[in-house]
Amino acid sequence: MNELANFANPLASTEHFDHIQISLASPERIRSWSFGEIKKPETINYRTFKPERDGLFCARIFGPIKDYECLCGKYKRMKYKGIVCEKCGVEVTVSKVRRERMGHIELAAPVAHIWFLKSLPSRIGLLLDMQLKQLERVLYFESYIVIEPGLTPLKKFQLLTEDELLEAQDQYGEDSFSAGIGAEAVKKLLEALDLETEREDLLEELKHTKSELKPKKIIKRLKVVESFIESGNRPEWMILEVIPVIPPELRPLVPLDGGRFATSDLNDLYRRVINRNNRLKRLMDLRAPDIIVRNEKRMLQEAVDALFDNGRRGRTITGGNKRPLKSLSDMLKGKQGRFRQNLLGKRVDYSGRSVITTGPELKLHQCGLPKKMALELFKPFIYSRLDAKGLSMTLKQAKKWVEKERKEVWDILEEVIREHPVMLNRAPTLHRLGIQAFEPVLIEGKAIQLHPLVCSAFNADFDGDQMAVHVPLSLEAQLEARVLMMSTNNILSPANGKPIIVPSQDMVLGIYYLSMLKENEPGEGMRLSNMTEVHQALNVGAVTLHSKIISRVPQVNEQGETYMKRVETTPGRMLLGETLPQNYKVPFETINRLLTKKDIADVIDTVYRHTGQKDTVLFADAIMSLGFKYACKAGISFGKDDMIVPAAKEALVEETRALVQDFEQQYQDGLITQQEKYNKVIDAWSRCGDRVAGEMMKEIQMVHKGPDGRELPVNAIYMMAHSGARGSAAQIKQLAGMRGLMAKPSGEIIETPIISNFKEGLTVLEYFNSTHGARKGLADTALKTANSGYLTRRLVDVSQDCVVVEDDCGTERALEMKAITQGGNVIASLGERILGRTLAEDIMGTDGQVAIPIGTLLDEAHIAVIEKIGIQSVKIRSPLVCESHGGVCAACYGRDLARGTPVNIGEAVGVIAAQSIGEPGTQLTMRTFHIGGAAQLNEQSHLEAVTDGRLQFRDLRTIIDPQGKQIALSRTGEVVLVGTDGRELASSRILLGAHLLHNDGDMVKKGDRLAEWDPFTIPVITESAGIVKYQDLVENQTLTEQVDEATGISQRVVIEYRAPRGKEDLRPRLTLMNGDSGETARYMLSPGTVISVDDGQEVLAGTVLARVSRESAKTRDITGGLPRVAELFEARKPKENAIIAKVSGRVEFGKDYKAKRKVIIRPDDGSEPIEYLVPKSKVIDAQEGDHVKRGDNLISGSPDPHDILEVLGVEALAEYLVSEIQEVYRLQGVKINDKHIETIVRQMLLKVEITHAGDSIFLPGEQVEKEDFEAVNAKLESQGQEPAQATPILLGITKASLQTRSFISAASFQETTRVLTEAAVQGKIDTLSGLKENVIVGRLIPAGTGAAMKRLRVTANSRDAALRAANKAVNFEQPTIAIESDNTDTPDAAE
């Protein structure tokens, strides 16, 4: 019965499975797959082209070459199906079986499987506890290994050379011990392993071991032993006796013209194995000398190695053309391998591609499709319509008609295409908006027409770009294309929720021109009653587009009634106002202003939020046409006189030249170093360039009046730049200011700037200097694209299975959000950061009532309420703290940014996050920034109040210095601004030595300066009066006189001192002697400290004793752009990483070592002190006796994310990663919502490391999924046993992708061999829960519409199971029905 069903639908048999398992194949298993043994290396007969019998293409084993025809031709046609020909032994069946039938080779001697030998860590090596080197010596016949020592003093597993073996046999007798060589010996050893006892011994050893490194090794072995026990694999299966041969159609041999053959490399590799195997058999039959047989066995081992993984060991086997042969492993690996080439990327039917051109008269949901393309793409639909209408009798006739292009065909094509969306795609598809659906409009010509507004989503322009068209065939596909992918449904960008359908370039210029207002235009002050009169006045020339007039515009009130409102405006703005949808939340004021590109985007955003999608689409289309029309009417153009070179340029340049000359002189006199001079010169020139640019912008913006008092036209270049249509201030600066500084190829800046601009023209030397940068720019762009693409791929891989799975996980945890400020400027306001997130706490109003309850999804209205109350920090839900299994919940994720509504269940938020972060990757820079000179000036050196309030000091000790200033003494102190109701509004850390301008409890206004400090040095301040004594400060050993470069005043500076052997190390410090009580305080001085007091000098409290230069004041390279983003996502340890205090406590200094010094923190709670070893060259940010808080830097630098996680927890880590990554994107002006970064960080935090096993099966130090860990603990607690303990760990995105549950997903990402080896040993099961696995096995992904199908299947399955159980209970006495038994093993039968 099944046979017949499968014949009708050959795929049916493989459809129902719900997981895939991979494991080692036993020899019996391999033989059971096989249809026969391959004995000869021959392939096909060169004269008859028929396969040789028993050869690699044998028809008897693999099946017939032609359908239903045996090899000799005795049986032909269907009627003989299933008969085996007695003459040639071939079964009569379909030739397709040659794609699925396997053969095998029986090896004359066992060989080791190279994956389990060489894929690190070597599995065979771990099981036998042998080193890989030793194993290889045995396997490749260099040394013997003792298998059973018997009563001899030899050790088991001991290696013996040939001479040693003979000696031992002479000494102890041949039969007293057994030794072997090659894979046979290893196989015996593996067979002899008792895994259960091995496991017990290892666990015992683990309990009693004392050393540091031993447990790691034991745990490694234990894991391998356990995985063999649990998976039911046998260790000896890693040694092969039988080799499977893949079906011949998968390694084809094709005759080329000219009598030659093209063949797959695998045939060569198999042939090599068969040849060596047959020769070995023959030699063994002939009883050849041992040495010859051994050599042949070694060659067989090498041949099998090459077949499985060519080049993994020894020489790579090459073919006739010196090209390495592609082995079975290479077939899977890399971009060209099976996974990425064929399973994850497929070519599709019904697609075409062509050049694109603009279609400004199209509606937003349309695209222009060339008739020729449409005819080809929609052929089957046309045939069926022709048939349905009875126009063509047969399919053949229909084909003819279409080929001849009769006029009926065009009418039918119009019908077929109506309301049938097509999908357009532009490569590279960096985010989901790279494929959108449109309704096709038939056009003449051969180019696809694209709507101008969707260009920014596709990143398309019309300089020869090509796009591909795909036709969704089934009704479901058409429905999804229309509902989900239609361009009108994708108005907002999924990355930041801002509109992506925004006018650009000409449209912006037209709208900007239209919204301009000018003084003294004709008709100024006219009163026009309505739009009709405005049109009339414009047509007769009574007013211009820019005249100030008073008119009335129709508006809608909240009840939806229309009324006329009187406004002061211009005719141009009235025209714009006509396009606005009628809604009381979108009043005329929205566009009654000068509109730049950013403003237009805001208008579209407002319209979308308040009036919905349909109105927005109509508005966008209308505003686009207006923009084009008036850009054309305005006729804006510019000539060289529009580039105004500022008059002040000459003077500014001269002034700077004099300054540079001055620095040069200081350098000649030895007052400043080369580096200092370089920094100052560059600083001076970059300031000069900026000032010239400022002057130029002033002159370009100036509005001049004509003799009649009318304003003359605005400078066209300024209009283009200011409106955001084209160009920027930086580009105008090069045209009319000065080009400024250029970089060398190495990335350093050339000291001589380019003083000319493009209008004046460059000198030869200037031109030459500017060529470096241009060339480097082009080289960088090429590298950037590849790097950015790879980052996106890693991000998608780590987050692909993160899908919204439920409405609310009910977690108690939350993230606290504050506004991000830098130097008193708000970079990202609180409102921006919490918009579209779920509240995790009640928000109290000023009246003490709940203003917004917990669990609210915050929209724009709520944000306004929060800002009005004046709250500074809000707790919200985040994907990071979500406790859903197998995904995130809708409440933790919040708003779906691309729709502006709560996120749907089934949304693939992980992939969206990855695309949102990866897509702008190409806009990031590749270079590392050189900070110094100019950049130092913007180092923050003061603190301002961000809001009105009362000042409070928290943990802040202060002292009045001799000048009467209030100085901060503590490192961890904060100033807090408190509102009238006592609520904390803002808080800031205060640096040591900062001068506080207000006292505790003062009322301050927004913008008041609270504190200021020197951004370049950290002072050492005394807390009491006394006499200073120098200790261990010896001239020319630990102390030196240096002349200050800028002022010429000499200073005493501490230098690094290495004590000679046997001498006591010097520890330079200052002590403060108090008159009555002797020594009161010690101040350790690190190298580079400048001492400000003399030996024996009397000082007052608050005196600065010494100054340490801050790291940030030095010129240093900071990684920026793409490399920085990658570094953060890969969770790499930074080069100069900061050391973080793990506990709060007091600092002490311990003993000094050769290059390190010991810093000890004594915790406040009296627990064990914690010690750190710090390089002496580093500046320690704390003095003896200082109190540090947990998480404070002991040494400045970039913190290591792993430390932050360990010391401060998940929330702090998230905050750090989000802010660091956002900073890079913000520099480039790219907006990405925080939740995307949080989603990726969540995927990096899915694992925990076991610290204490308790009664669980986990091993200490093992990394397990958080979900598994929690499930095991819940089970242990319910049984009253001791649960395991663990700490969260952070994995980089590459590592996290390789450690996902799904081995299919991991194997298709990177390191395919390693992943598959590991999975096979563990007998891993892939439950196909992620997106990637499902794409690979060819199913609907469990996200989006596929998620609904999955849910239905799960409910149906559970219902079936319940029914079956009920039936069993009822029919307990009766035998089960036979038909049912066919499907009982397939849980998916419900489908």
From Swiss-Prot:
Transmembrane segments annotated in the record for this chain: none
Superkingdom of the source species: Bacteria
Known cofactor(s): Mg(2+); Zn(2+)
Binding, Mg(2+): 461, 463, 465
E.C. number: 2.7.7.6
A Gene Ontology biological process term: DNA-templated transcription
Family: Belongs to the RNA polymerase beta' chain family.
UniProt name for this protein: DNA-directed RNA polymerase subunit beta'
Species annotation: Zymomonas mobilis subsp. mobilis (strain ATCC 31821 / ZM4 / CP4)
This protein's encoding gene: rpoC
